[in-house]
Each structure stands twice: as C-alpha cells, then as structure tokens.
C-alpha cells in the first residue's frame, strides 16, 4: 500500500524495521532480506527513492557487510562503496527534494531548517559525504548550511596523529580556523 501511494517514508521505515527484526531473530535471514531490498533498489525508477534505498543499503553493508560477504572481504567493501556513491549520485535532485515526502522515516532534526528540510542533508549525513553537501550549499548560496557541511567535513576528513603536532601546527586546527574565518559572520560558525 505504501508503495502504490508513494508513501516513501512509511515504506522505508517498514523495510528498515523488517530487516532489523529479521536480523535480531535469525541472523541467517539477513542476506535474503538485504537481497530483497537490493532487488527493489534495482527496480525503482524514482530517483529519490533509489537514493534512499542506496543509503539504507550502504548503512547495512557498512555495519553488517562482513557477514553478508564473509567469504569475500573485497566484495563487502565494493558493495559499501557502490551504495555510498549511488546514494548521493544526484546532488541537485536531493537538494530539491523535501524530506516531508519521506516521513516518518526522516524526522526533522534541530538543523533541518538550516538545510531547508531537504533530502540531501539527510543522505549526506547518513553516508558521511560532506564535501558534495558543502559544494551544493555553497553554490546555491545557503551559507549557513555550507558552514555546517564544511565543519563536518573538517571533523571527519582532516586526520592527524594524536600528539604528532603542536596545537599551533595542527592541520585540524588550521582547517577549522579557516572555516570559522570564512563564516565568522554566521551564528552557526561560533
């Protein structure tokens, strides 16, 4: 019913809850459940729904991939990367799609208004893809969202070895300082 009514949130919530329940009751049933979602992902022509399926599959493979491909670690890594890339393949479409279509799966957080309640912010956050998120908001002129995306990017991508650098020479501190300098006029930067 949810699929025919395009109630994507209801549909996705049901799929996720179903996979979690199957996994908690009988861990051997995880693979068939994932294969069903993969089949639905392959069949859909709805770009927004395809992105949501890809994000869900990315999360499953990221958390349970070693069980899904126990005989082939590279297969698990390849699937994880494939679904992560597919989840955010159409950044512009995701930026224009409002998450209301996907309720109750997507519950608006405290920053939802900064991102305009769009699907891009949800999927980029779920898959940890902050650079495309930053680029989209920067290009579209949403400086508050670009600032948050840039801060998340620095937080997750600028790596350093603990204790290797003095604070004054830390790549993380330099990157963070640069972001704050660019967006110092915004409340979300401070």
Language-model regions, residue ranges each:
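Extracytoplasmic/secretory-pathway proteins
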Residues: 1-190
């Amino acid at each position: 019913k949810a699929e025919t009514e395009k109630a994507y949130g209801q549909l996705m919530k049901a799929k996720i809850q179903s996979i979690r329940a199957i996994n908690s009751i009988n861990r051997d049933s995880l693979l068939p459940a994932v294969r069903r979602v993969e089949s639905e992902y392959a069949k859909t022509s709805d770009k927004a729904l395809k992105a949501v399926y890809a994000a869900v599959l990315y999360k499953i493979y990221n958390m349970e991939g070693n069980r899904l491909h126990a005989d082939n670690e590279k297969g698990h890594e390849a699937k994880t990367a494939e679904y992560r890339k597919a989840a955010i393949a159409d950044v512009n479409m995701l930026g224009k799609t409002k998450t209301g279509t996907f309720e109750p799966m997507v519950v608006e957080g405290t920053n939802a208004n900064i991102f305009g309640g769009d699907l891009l912010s949800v999927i980029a956050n779920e898959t940890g893809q902050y650079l495309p998120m930053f680029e989209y908001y920067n290009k579209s002129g949403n400086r508050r969202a670009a600032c948050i995306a840039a801060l998340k990017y620095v937080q997750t991508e600028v790596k350093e070895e603990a204790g290797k650098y003095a604070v004054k020479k830390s790549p993380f501190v330099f990157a963070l300082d640069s972001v704050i300098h660019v967006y110092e006029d915004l409340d979300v930067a401070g």
